[in-house]
Amino acid sequence: MRHRKSGRQLNRNSSHRKAMFSNMASSLVRHEVIKTTLPKAKELRRVVEPLITLAKTDSVANRRLAFARTRDNEVVAKLFNELGPRFAARQGGYTRILKCGFRAGDKAPMAYIELVDRPEAAVEAAAE
């Protein structure tokens, strides 16, 4: 029985799921908006939001925890230098999920997941 088991399986084994969400979290931090399927976006939110909360307090231990989850120094630097200070006053809710129709090949529901309070230049670049 799967009573009280949280998280979606997404037809992947645990190592594949962990790697996928690590890569997706890195992409979201780097680009601040990505397009993916709706269930993946909803699960990604559970990975990215704690990372940003971690980045609000800059310490060596927190940087190491963030690196352990993303395996990317560039992403860790952006988390702690840009996103942590940007979201310092916000108590959670750092991401927004926008539904954007269905994929042509298999009718999978698609969504954009983005960081809220993005700078205007990033918003205009993403729109193009």
Curated annotation (Swiss-Prot):
Say which domain of life the source belongs to.
Bacteria
* Keyword tags: Ribonucleoprotein, Ribosomal protein
Annotated PROSITE patterns = RIBOSOMAL_L17
Q: Which SUPFAM superfamilies has this protein been placed in?
A: Prokaryotic ribosomal protein L17
Gene3D superfamilies (alphabetical)? Ribosomal protein L17
Family the UniProt entry places it in: Belongs to the bacterial ribosomal protein bL17 family.
Q: How does it assemble?
A: Part of the 50S ribosomal subunit. Contacts protein L32.
Name listed for the protein in its UniProt record: Large ribosomal subunit protein bL17
Question: Which species does this protein come from?
Answer: Vibrio cholerae serotype O1 (strain ATCC 39315 / El Tor Inaba N16961)
- Taxonomically, what lineage is the organism? Bacteria, Pseudomonadati, Pseudomonadota, Gammaproteobacteria, Vibrionales
Q: Which gene encodes it?
A: rplQ
